[in-house]
UniProtKB/Swiss-Prot annotation:
Domain LisH, chain residue ranges per copy: 14-46
Organism for this UniProt entry: Saccharomyces cerevisiae (strain JAY291)
Protein name (database record): Nuclear distribution protein PAC1
HAMAP family in the cross-refs: lis1 (MF_03141)
Protein's gene: PAC1
One cellular-component annotation, GO: cytoplasm
Taxon lineage: Eukaryota, Fungi, Dikarya, Ascomycota, Saccharomycotina
Subcellular location: Cytoplasm, Cytoskeleton; Cytoplasm, Cytoskeleton, Spindle pole
Function field: Positively regulates the activity of the minus-end directed microtubule motor protein dynein. Plays a central role in positioning the mitotic spindle at the bud neck during cell division. Targets cytoplasmic dynein to microtubule plus ends, thereby promoting dynein-mediated microtubule sliding along the bud cortex and consequently the movement of the mitotic spindle to the bud neck.
Domain of life: Eukaryota
Family: Belongs to the WD repeat LIS1/nudF family.
Length: 494
């Protein structure tokens, strides 16, 4: 055996079959091209192929079969194996693509197995509920795993997502003005869908009413704001799985950028802000506008409500605190370099002295009911602010503190690479999403970024939501939902 035969990784039989396949392909190719396009070279090419078969084919039977099939007098004979070589070549390419896909799927499954093993370890250490609320604290320390539990697809970009406070339902609002409700245990088709606006939905909020000493039945309210200048109020009818529109709120003269609904005693109010530079307070029961004030000189992009106070963030890069019943502006925060996308109050949590910003530092702040707030901006930062105490007087509306009316920035979180779109606070963690396609989890105690989800979406991440931890009517669950420009919502569940 020669040296080149030793290097060839084929047996004699395999080499003979390969040679026959090559010759059959050459024979087919010459029939298709040379005979029709280069007729003058026909005989010379045919003779060369026959000669080549004499060198390559070892068995005389194989040579005779090939010469017979190549005979010009036998035009009707077709060798079924003439295209065997190109077919095998194409099969190898398809097989390589399939192998790459299988390797990617295997990598994903291995990651899921690691996450599940981590969850099993956590469950093994999980303690049952005790009188001092041990399990509640464990729930608040939950950080979602790397991969979502389910993926929801809709027809256009997701602009806002909200979890039902009690049921495994997620509400999804889109850039085409559609509103969806999905069952998290059967999310292939929506429970309900509604064309709620003629233009994009910009914001959404939900509230499960808690009417006491009243004949009114409690139910879930869904409020949406839109670029069509309208605010729509819906009742979620659980028995029929549908949205029932209660009313529309009209009054803003430009895009309605954010909406918030809250309840105090048996009174339910809705707050909205707009590009017309105003903030409006609405009565939920009759739809009347109770108050309108202008806290900023430019587009008001975000609001949050705590009792009689509203915090607002604007295109003018500032955030302001306002006493909404009187319309008195109380204090202002400056420090962002670009427009503010989201603002939120940081609510106090009882019996959590170890969590920074979640307990009051003085009795005066405790009596007032708030001390800190957080803002997210297009300057890629998240800032936590201490709100100055206003001048509080009995039976009179609060007024600005003449010696201290400026927010004090106590912590700046840096890590996002583009506009920060939304934030949510649970326990000692702050979750944020941004146009850099990532979601981040921050530790409020240290200011460190604990976890980054970088491949949840292929476009901007516009919204996220977790259960609140400060409402006694809402039991926090280990769930998080995100919505993005790629028309997808990712849901994380334990």
């Amino acid at each position: 055996m020669t040296n080149w035969q030793q290097q060839l990784p084929l047996t004699d039989t395999q080499k003979n079959e390969l040679d026959k396949s090559v010759l059959r392909y050459l024979n087919w190719n010459y029939k298709q091209t040379v005979r029709h396009e280069h007729a003058q070279d026909y005989e010379s090419v045919r003779h060369a192929i026959v000669t080549l078969s004499g060198f390559l084919l070892q068995e005389s039977v194989d040579r005779q079969e090939f010469i017979s099939n190549n005979d010009t007098s036998n035009e009707s004979m077709v060798d079924i194996d003439e295209l065997l070589l190109p077919k095998k070549w194409n099969s190898i390419v398809r097989l390589q693509k399939k192998i790459i896909e299988l390797e990617q799927n295997t990598e994903t499954l291995v990651s899921q197995i690691k996450d599940l093993n981590t969850q099993v370890s956590e469950l093994a250490q999980f303690k049952p509920t005790t009188s001092n609320g041990t399990s509640a604290h464990n729930v608040l320390k939950w950080i979602p795993r790397n991969l979502p539990s389910c993926l929801i697809n809709v027809e256009s970009s997701v602009t806002s997502v909200k979890l039902h406070p009690n049921l495994p339902i997620v509400f999804v609002a889109t850039d085409h003005g559609k509103l969806y409700a999905f069952d998290l245990f059967n999310y292939t088709i929506p429970l309900a869908s509604l064309q709620s606006h003629t233009k994009a939905i910009t914001s959404m909020d939900v509230l499960f009413t808690n009417f006491t000493n009243s004949s009114k039945k409690n139910y879930l309210v869904v409020v949406t704001a839109s670029k069509d200048l309208q605010i729509h109020v819906f009742k979620w009818v659980s028995e029929e799985c549908k949205f029932q529109q209660i009313r529309s709120l009209l009054g803003h003269e430009h895009i309605v950028s954010a909406v918030k609904i809250w309840q105090k005693n048996n009174d339910v109010h809705i707050a909205s802000c707009s590009r017309d530079q105003t903030v409006k307070i609405w009565d939920f029961h009759n739809g009347w506008s109770l108050k309108t004030f202008q806290p900023h000189s430019q587009w008001v992009r975000s609001i949050d409500v705590l009792g009689d106070y509203i915090i607002s963030g604007s295109h003018d890069t500032t955030l302001r605190l306002t006493h909404w019943p009187s319309g008195n502006g109380l204090s202002v925060g400056t420090g962002h370099e670009f427009p503010i996308e989201k603002v939120k109050f940081i609510h106090f949590i009882e019996d959590s002295p170890e969590i920074r910003f979640r307990t009051p530092s003085t009795d005066r702040y405790k009596n007032w009911g708030m001390q800190y707030c957080v803002s997210a901006s297009r300057d890629r930062t998240i800032k936590i602010w201490e709100i100055p105490l206003p001048t509080l007087m009995a039976h009179r509306a609060p007024i600005p503190n003449p010696t201290d009316s400026n927010f004090r920035c106590v912590l700046t979180l840096k890590g996002h690479l583009s506009w920060v779109r939304d934030i949510s606070i649970r326990g000692q963690y702050l979750f944020s999403c941004a146009d850099d396609k990532s979601v981040r989890c921050w530790d409020l105690n240290t200011g460190q970024c604990l976890h980054v989800w970088e491949k949840l979406h292929t476009g901007f991440v516009n919204s996220l939501d977790l259960d609140v931890d400060f409402d006694s009517n809402v039991t926090p669950r280990q769930m998080m939902v995100t919505g993005g420009l790629d028309c997808k919502s990712n849901v994380f569940m334990r």
